[in-house]
Amino acid sequence: EAGEECDCGAPANPCCDAATCKLRPGAQCAEGDCCEQCRFVKEGTVCREAKGDWNDDSCTGQSADCPRNGF
């Protein structure tokens, strides 16, 4: 939702302040295939295995989302 940095529905998430829906100090992310322990995983980490004609999808190191790298 607008103004939220993370999903504050789960107070157990150590990366997200459930009261404010903002990332805790020092956290880069709260969830995602490229987020681990509140930090973006390093560039080149495979986040989705190759399928058919598609190549492995790899994290960018700049986002918690796993991008579609394509062919």
UniProtKB/Swiss-Prot annotation:
Gene3D superfamilies the UniProt entry points to: Disintegrin domain (4.10.70.10)
Q: Which residues form the Disintegrin domain?
A: 1-71
Per the Swiss-Prot or TrEMBL annotation, the motif Cell attachment site is positioned at: 51-53
Q: In which tissues is it expressed?
A: Expressed by the venom gland.
Kindly report the protein's main subcellular placement as a broad class: secreted
Which cysteine pairs are joined by S-S bonds? C6-C21, C8-C16, C15-C38, C29-C35, C34-C59, C47-C66
Q: Which GO terms describe its cellular component?
A: extracellular region; plasma membrane
Pfam families associated with the record: Disintegrin
Q: Where in the cell is it found?
A: Secreted
Determine if Ion transport is one of this entry's keywords: no
A molecular-function term among this protein's GO annotations: toxin activity
- Keywords from the UniProt entry: Cell adhesion impairing toxin, Disulfide bond, Hemostasis impairing toxin, Platelet aggregation inhibiting toxin, Secreted, Toxin
**What function is annotated for this protein?**
Suppress platelet aggregation induced by ADP, collagen, thrombin, and epinephrine (IC(50)=170-330 nM). Also dose-dependently inhibits the adhesion of human melanoma cells to fibrinogen but not to fibronectin.
Quote additional remarks. Answer: The disintegrin belongs to the dimeric disintegrin subfamily.
The entry sums up its family as follows: Belongs to the venom metalloproteinase (M12B) family. P-II subfamily. P-IId sub-subfamily.
Quaternary structure, from the entry: Homodimer.
Under PANTHER family, the record lists: ADAM A DISINTEGRIN AND METALLOPROTEASE DOMAIN (PTHR11905), DISINTEGRIN AND METALLOPROTEINASE DOMAIN-CONTAINING PROTEIN 28 (PTHR11905:SF32)
The protein in question is named Disintegrin ussuristatin-2
Organism whose genome encodes this protein = Gloydius ussuriensis (Ussuri mamushi)
